[in-house]
Amino acid sequence: MMEESALLNDHVFSDALEPIVNIPRRTIGSNPQIDPCEMNGQIHFLTTAYFKNTEYERCLGMVKDMANLTGKIVLGSSWELACEYGRGETRSQLLAKKEKLSPTFFATNYESRWVGSSDACIVDVNKMLNLRTLPKAELKSDGKSEYYIGVDVARSTKTNNNQTSIVVGKVKRDKKDKVKHIQIVNIVNLPNGTNFTGQAIAVKRLQKLYNAVSVIIDINGLGVGLLDEVMKLHQDPITGEELIAFDTINTEHESDEAETLRCVWGIQAQGLNTDIIVNFINMVESGGLQLLEKVDQNAIANADSDFLTNRILPHVQTELLIEEVANLSLEQLNGGKLTVKRNSKSIDKDRYSALVYMIWYIMTQQNKSREEEEEFNIASICCFSSPKIR
């Protein structure tokens, strides 16, 4: 009997576990016998739904075998079956819980729905889950570390598809100043319909809180509107403090303000898609990316507003980030270029986009070792001697 079989990949099962149950047990003694009443050779898989993986493919195969009467059977149901028979929580209690829990958590644990992409997923979701090693979010700079901010600007003015996502990353370097880890210490999703002024103020607040080295903004399409806005002087409507105007590092856009902070890198992602995707895949495969730990869902249901916002919400946003990544399939275009496609249009990729923009910038613009930055001195490879006068 395989408990929580969704967590088991098919290679390990075929190599280490399946051979055990294929051999029936025998009695002890000089003439061991097989018990004819014991159900030998049967394998029972018990699991909740999960991200689509090899176990998902096994379930599909078993359903087809059951239809073809090959001796296999698949049973499953959602929370509604238990409610129908009066078991556990009531329908109203579960629907109220659905409003508070992560969509992925509720879909897999209560609705028996497998989530994500099983075909050409951009990265192995199990590897992504293994990156969740950070115990708690950071709500401001620790005073000594190096922070960067990635921003994906809403692509539409529609309220159901108008979320700007902001990802905060902390860089850990090795002895040669090369990037060793990028820790995602906070993720913020702005409310639907927030105008450019509100978005700019939110970005500036976060830049000030973390003393971020750079703010990476996608300036394709509507992103130019946010770029224009962050180059203006603002006053925080909550604290009343002045928020300095930003200026760009790599574009010809210039602020009209006399005093500016040159920290914005404008990225035009359409021409860099392949490099952006490859850098993201490399960070996941190498373990260089680190994410916030999975949060106890009971803590979400029982948390007060302040604790939920400041401590729990970044972990929930990380959960939604993984859901976005699991929903993406990798596609190869003509000429060998890469792009990603959403399998379910109901799941956006705002958090993913903000994350990969930031990773690309850090790995391509901020990843030079000390040796690479040292000035070239021709005297170090050539010998010169002063001429002798005869």
Protein language model features and the residues they cover:
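Short, conserved "post-DEAD/DEAH" coupling segment immediately C-terminal to helicase motif II
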Residues: 10-38
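RNase H-like, metal-dependent nuclease domains and their acidic two-metal-ion catalytic environment used
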Residues: 2-11, 39-64, 85-250, 274, ...
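Short mixed-charge
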Residues: 26-36, 236-260
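Short amphipathic C-terminal alpha-helix that caps PH/PH-like domains
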Residues: 17-21, 284, 355-361
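Conserved RecA-like P-loop NTPase helicase motor core
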Residues: 260-284
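Conserved AAA+ ATPase "SRH/arginine-finger" region at the nucleotide-binding site
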Residues: 77-82
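Short glycine-/polar-rich loops that comprise or flank the Walker A/P-loop
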Residues: 39-42, 70-74
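Residue-level signal for alpha-helix termini/capping positions
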Residues: 22-26, 208, 285
